[in-house]
Amino acid sequence: MGNSFRSDRVAVEIQREINDILRNKVRDPRVQDVNITDVQLTGDLSQATVYYSLLSNLASDNEKAATALKKATGLFKSELAKRMTIFKIPDLTFAKDESVEYGSKIDELLRGLNNKSEY
C-alpha cells in the first residue's frame, strides 16, 4: 500500500518534469504539439509508461512524434536524473493516449444527438 502512494507521487513528478523538458530542452519540431497526459509506474519504479496526446489527428504526425519521443528517451532519462532525487530513473516507454480522441468522439456524438432532438 505504501508503494502505491510513492509510485503515484513519483509518476506525477515524472509527468511534470517530462512536460517541462519537452517545452524547454527538446528542440525537435515533431514533438512541438505533444502533451504528456499521464505516467503509469510499476510497483518497483523500474518501468514507466508515459502517455501523450497530440493536437494533430494526422497519422503521419503521430508516427513522427512517436519516433521523436523514442529518440529523445536518453535525454529525458538524463534530465530526470539531474532533476529528481530517486535512486534509479525508470525505463521510459511512450504510448499514445487514445482517451483524448475517444472523449472528443463521444462529445461530438452527443452534440449530434442534441442537434437532432432540437428539430
Swiss-Prot record:
Intrachain S-S bonds: none
Keywords: Cytoplasm, Ribosome biogenesis
Single GO biological process annotation from the record: maturation of SSU-rRNA
Protein name in the entry: Ribosome-binding factor A
Record-level GO cellular component terms: cytosol
The keyword Cytoplasm appears for this protein: yes
Species of provenance: Lactococcus lactis subsp. lactis (strain IL1403)
Annotated gene: rbfA
Transmembrane spans: none
Cellular location(s): Cytoplasm
Its biological purpose: One of several proteins that assist in the late maturation steps of the functional core of the 30S ribosomal subunit. Associates with free 30S ribosomal subunits (but not with 30S subunits that are part of 70S ribosomes or polysomes). Required for efficient processing of 16S rRNA. May interact with the 5'-terminal helix region of 16S rRNA.
InterPro entries linked to this entry: KH_dom-like_a/b, RbfA, RbfA_dom_sf, Ribosome-bd_factorA_CS
Family per similarity comment: Belongs to the RbfA family.
Pfam name, any one: RBFA
GO molecular function, one term: ribosomal small subunit binding
Summary of subunit composition and partner proteins: Monomer. Binds 30S ribosomal subunits, but not 50S ribosomal subunits or 70S ribosomes.
